[in-house]
Amino acid sequence: MFCLPQQESTAPTTCTGSASTQDMDSGYGDGLQGECLRKPDQTQPKLYGVGDPTATFSSDSSCLSSRGRVIKWFWDSAEEGYRTYHMDEYDEDKNPSGIINLGTSENKLCFDLLSWRLTQGDMLHVEPSLLQYPDWRGHLFLREEVAKFLSFYCKSPAPLKPENVVVLNGCASLFSALATVLCEAGEALLIPTPYYGAITQHIYLYGNVRLAYVYLDSKVTGLNTRPFQLTVEKLEMVLQGVSSEGVKVKGLILINPQNPLGDVYSPEELQDFLRFAMRHKLHVIMDEVYMLSVFEESLGYRSVLSLERLPDPQRTHVMWATSKDFGMSGLRFGVLYTENQHVATAVASLCRYHGLSGLVQHQMAQLLRDHDWISQVYLPENHARLKAAHTYVSEELRALGIPFVSRGAGFFIWVDLRKYLCKGTFEEEALLWRQFLDNKVLLSSGKTFECKEPGWFRVVFSDKENRLRLGMQRMRQVLEGQSQVVEDASPCHAQEPQSQPR
């Protein structure tokens, strides 16, 4: 986690950060300490939690540029858990004592369905145009299928247009591209926390764009409130605080369904947030990468593209990918839908570096046009498997007396382990994360999502039954041991967990 020492601020809910960690990630790296490459710019405002990201690097420790050292630092410090997992990955036959990964948000439940569909005859096609340079927005045949797909599954009130579609190799590239074309270096985007921490890296490494954190907490203040609830009032407070510190805010990032909370924004909330952005002339980046992974129908999920009227369509940009909903995180495919042709053209220009091969574009077009298979075979079975896995992990957590937040969207449960911390600090959270890893189960810690309350963890449940059972057994072993440690330590007062919806 890259967060420089915080300084006093008159806006305690505001933190502008310049880096974070990856989703696979749950890692607590050691961080690099060394001589400053150069002194921080004295003219830069003393922002809450912000400084010169190159200041921790030795001037003679590497052949890399200062920018290259920052990039390497991310790799060294932010992915320890994921690298450790890959060096000791669990295999039922070859490595039964290896690490179970309940930290990376991937859907591993439907490989049988996907492998069948991706090996059908219509997927195997080669023609000259697929081997030549394409339109950088993506081949027209693919953009037409994407527009039809989003129109149908987002339930848009009018058909979406292929000229508003840009395709590229995943949402990480899309975040990088959007931040670069929408923001000047040093400007910021608002984002509610906890959030998918890799976004900070995506927008910072290329565009030098930062995030202004809208810190949310687990406290429930009334009948109509819920844990970690975003409101317009909180957005206004952080926007004013960051602006008063001399940082220009250019937009708002919303993840819906939410990662790591497994919750969704209501249509009314979406409209409120969009109107807030319009009042302040902010772009809104809507990340809807889990839109087809809502397995509780009672949630009533609505895509922003389903709204009858967008307050500011020229500043509303929607992203989606196959990584989550179709369990294809290794097949890089992401989509931008925007009515702003200046934004679409600028992002398309960057697709020279983030484009898709013609063969992959053909395969994706074939997949997305197969509404019968998607609606009648894949989605019902995927939702059933997600729900069964979610039910199992939820019951295990209840048996342990562990509160959690999860309303039936995505692949994860946001788990409250604060009572297992001897002290309510992120150092204690890191020690607990390390205990899990030492006991061969990888989780994602709350710090990697910029959660303001130490002791929260994200548990991914979208895996096969045997791995889930073993992973939960290993979690239980750690927590039972930690309970004894907390009980024996004196004086030691664990923070009482607040009641959370189950």
UniProtKB/Swiss-Prot annotation:
The modification N6-(pyridoxal phosphate)lysine is found at K324. Substrate binds at E106. SUPFAM superfamilies: PLP-dependent transferases. Keywords: Pyridoxal phosphate. GO terms for molecular function: identical protein binding; pyridoxal phosphate binding. Pfam families: Aminotran_1_2 (PF00155). Disulfide bonds: none annotated. GO terms for biological process: biosynthetic process. InterPro entries: Aminotransferase_I/II_large, Ethylene_sulfur-biosynth, PyrdxlP-dep_Trfase, PyrdxlP-dep_Trfase_major, PyrdxlP-dep_Trfase_small. Residues 1-24 are annotated as: Disordered. It comes from the Eukaryota. Belongs to the class-I pyridoxal-phosphate-dependent aminotransferase family. Does not catalyze the synthesis of 1-aminocyclopropane-1-carboxylate but is capable of catalyzing the deamination of L-vinylglycine. This is 1-aminocyclopropane-1-carboxylate synthase-like protein 1. It comes from Mus musculus. The gene is Accs.
